[in-house]
Design a protein with these regions (language model features):
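Conserved AdoMet/S-adenosylmethionine-binding subsite of the radical SAM
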Residues: 1-114
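C-terminal accessory regions of radical SAM enzymes
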Residues: 84-87, 92-153
Length: 153
């Protein structure tokens, strides 16, 4: 079971995802499921440029995921914005982070993929810490046992 976590800090998680459970609630739920042997992990996406794409945030999410029993973390160090969703996102940016819309427009224009200037460094930090803590950066997929022909007698 995957849990989306993009902010280690509850105050920022509530700001970026109004109406969704705070990150600490997600980690508590993950820990409860992992303790029962359920395969759990984190989808750490999107990391919004200029908001939550910091080394401190990434490291804190990885450490909290480890503590909660996560088996894997799948990251995306940026955000994708299609036409239509971009306008909605920009309006939400202006409400939640006044002045940031102009920076997004200047940095990313109408690009679909919007990656912050430190995305490569964040990816390195993420992969090194996951390796150190023994957290996979890929998800194991369920593979059913191969079918066998039944005999009639």
């Amino acid at each position: 079971m995957s849990f989306t976590v993009t902010c280690a800090d509850d105050a920022l998680s509530v700001r970026t995802e109004p109406g969704a459970p705070a990150s600490s609630e997600r980690f508590r739920t993950m820990a409860a499921l992992a303790a029962k042997g359920i395969y759990t992990g984190v989808t750490m996406m999107p990391l919004l440029p200029l908001i939550n794409d910091t080394r401190e945030n990434v490291e804190a999410i990885v450490r909290r995921a480890k503590d909660a029993g996560a088996s894997y973390i799948l990251p995306m160090f940026g955000v994708t914005l299609r036409s239509g969703s971009r306008e909605h996102f920009h309006a939400a940016l202006e409400r939640g982070f006044p002045g940031l819309k102009a920076r997004y427009e200047a940095c990313f224009g109408n690009r679909y993929e919007c990656f912050g200037p430190n995305c490569r460094a964040l990816d390195d930090t993420f992969r090194n810490l996951c390796a150190k803590l023994g957290i996979a950066t890929r998800m194991e997929f369920y593979r059913p046992a191969s079918a066998q022909q039944q005999t009639l007698f």
